[in-house]
Amino acid sequence: MAHKIRFGSHILPGLIFLIGCLGLLWGITNVARGATSDALFDLEAKLLKFETFNRTTAATTLDGTTARDLEACDTHSQRALLLLEIPLADAALRSGAVQEFDLRSGALETRAQQTLSCAPRDSLVWLLLFGLKNEHGLLDERTFDLLKMSYETSPNEAWIAVRRVVVAVPTILSAPEAVRELVLAEFQALVRRGFVETPALAYFSASPQVRSMLQSRLDQLDASERAGFTRAVEKLKS
């Protein structure tokens, strides 16, 4: 069991960013105890806008009757529940609650697989599965196939790219060459398009070797494209 805690400390912060909790305190917004499918659809939209939710009410929603009885192909609701479960797994990891962590991460993987059986082009869920495998220390070719699927199912969508860069960049040294190129190209494209905050975070947190690889892509941009990125990195230093 202990190996999960060790590996998890490297990847779950990236998964946490999928729901916008990075650098934020948990909000006071509550999810209704008797959540319906329509309410979960609305919840998904809020989470994808980086709104945050109270842990207790998140757990109540996940453990409630609606979550248990939800149809596997109600993909928006399933995704909302996935997004709610990630920070609960992180909280268990940080507190050393190994049994709860195993329970939460197992539930995440099961729900993700169910969602993909109905929505095989859900790039966010492919990314989540990649993160979970990484969290367990499984950075093999099959794991990177999951990340590749996330890229292939949303090659030019900023909403997923700004999340994916935070999860993918820390693994770049282990990635096959083709996947490494996808990671670097998306990092560069985000900066070029002015989406600088998450690439800056990935750059700021990177090892010297990874940072050098990212810098080589930054050097290909013109000064005006790099300016916003430089300011974003400086903010992280302050």
Predicted feature locations:
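Short, Lys/Arg-rich N-terminal segment immediately upstream of the first membrane anchor
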Residues: 1-9
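Hydrophobic membrane-insertion alpha-helices, especially the h-region
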Residues: 9-31
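Short, flexible segments with low predicted structural confidence
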Residues: 11-15, 96-97, 121-122
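Alpha-helical repeat scaffolds
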Residues: 20-24, 58-67, 100-115, 141-151, ...
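Amphipathic alpha-helical repeat scaffolds of TPR domains
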Residues: 33-50, 69-95, 119-132, 158-169, ...
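Alpha-helical solenoid scaffolds that mediate protein-protein interactions
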Residues: 43-72, 108, 115, 150, ...
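Non-cytosolic head/periplasmic domains of membrane-anchored proteins
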Residues: 98-169, 175
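Extracytoplasmic/periplasmic C-terminal soluble domains
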Residues: 149-238
